[in-house]
Amino acid sequence: GVMGSTPWCKLDKVKFLCPAPGYDRHFGITEHFGIEMITIPMTAEGPDMDLVEEYVKDPAVKGIWCVPMYTNPLGITYSENVCKRMADLNPAAEDFRIYWDNAYCVHHLYDEEEKQDHLPEMLSMCKANGKENMILEFASTSKISFAGAGISCIAASKDNLDWVKKSMTVQIISHDKINQLRHVRFFKDLNGIKEHMKKHAAIMRPKFELVLDVLEKELGGLGIGTWTKPLGGYFISFDTMEGCAKAVYQKCKDAGVTLTTVGATYPYKKDPHDTNIRIAPSFPSMEELKQCAELFALCVKLASVEKLLENK
């Protein structure tokens, strides 16, 4: 088990807190292992901490998934207040961990610092509260160098790292040291990564701005949808009127545009209000993206009109 605790497979019930909308692959992991997922609604500042603080009183709750910076899919960054409360949690389970997936820590869309989000440093905050073992922070170069072929890293207390290394020794004989060296020689240091990410931003920024411009032009002020305006990350989160997301998805698909499957951003793929759609602008060309965004806006209008007529 976690640092000598009872292995989860020997417990009757294991639960995880899942801020949602959130990362579908996190939810896929917990679902695969039969771990009960508890949906924690997201606010503009991060997870609803009143609920988090209440749920961790249950010793069966063993962890919480967090993408704290430019969250997938909302694109928001946890506020200092949320981070402070997270770092001061009092979980009943000694093996409770905050799984702090800082995947988008350098993924800014703008070079100017005032147009970038900033995230408090959580390991030192937890340590200051005497809770340094409560957090496992990890990230990778998946969206920096090579998707699925970069390098990953973990930051944690010495106790946690000793425990992790003990498991990793069994899992793998040796990591790809040539790939590690390749990354070190290419990036050299943190400044090298920041400079490289400016090149990513130069590609991503106009795509985000294009989609946001189309949404504002076509849907602004109509009251049939809301959307985030991220300063970084890879996604724009769009909320339709209640009960319309699946219809929008299907209309787009029928017209030749494939969106992220509706519901994917929630545990068990169940969006309780059928509203959330994750928009990923990175892949299409600018010309294709403009067509896709305009078609998406049209499908939102059609689905909304149908819903309003249905409710008359």
Question: Language-model segments: what does each one mean?
Answer:
Residues 198-212, 224-239, 253:
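Conserved glycine-rich beta-strand-loop-beta hairpin in the small C-terminal domain of fold type I
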